[in-house]
């Protein structure tokens, strides 16, 4: 199972580096904010391109990233685990 992390608005891989290194496996950082996505269709298309047909995904989201992760989990059957952080 591949793990992905979506941080809050304005965050980047450096903000979550220490947290992600504490986890027991590799976690890939996703940054939807740099793409200036305008709607749900663009968000879903971006996510589909990022996950590259994984069979099973754990999606971790923090703050606004948690809201996005929750929505994406409801739209993609590949997301089998969802972790929301505040």
What are these regions (language model features)?
Residues 52-53, 61, 74-76:
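Short, charge-rich binding segments
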Residues 59-61, 85:
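Short beta-strand immediately N-terminal to the catalytic nucleophile in serine-hydrolase-like folds
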Residues 18, 71-75:
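Active-site signature of alpha/beta-hydrolase-fold catalytic machinery across serine-
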Residues 1-54:
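Active-site catalytic motif of lipid deacylating hydrolases and related acyltransferases
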Residues 2, 56-58, 81:
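Structural motif
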Residues 78-86:
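A conserved short beta-strand
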Residues 61-65, 69:
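Gly/Ala-rich beta-loop-alpha elbow adjacent to hydrolase catalytic centers
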């Amino acid at each position: 199972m591949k793990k992905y992390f979506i941080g809050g608005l304005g965050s980047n891989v450096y903000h979550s580096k220490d947290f992600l290194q504490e986890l027991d496996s590799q976690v890939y950082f996703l940054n939807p904010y740099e793409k200036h996505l305008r709607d749900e269709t663009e968000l879903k298309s971006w996510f589909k391109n990022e996950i590259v047909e994984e069979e099973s995904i754990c999606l971790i989201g923090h703050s606004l990233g948690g809201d996005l992760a929750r929505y994406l989990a409801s739209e993609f059957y590949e997301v089998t685990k969802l972790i929301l952080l505040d």
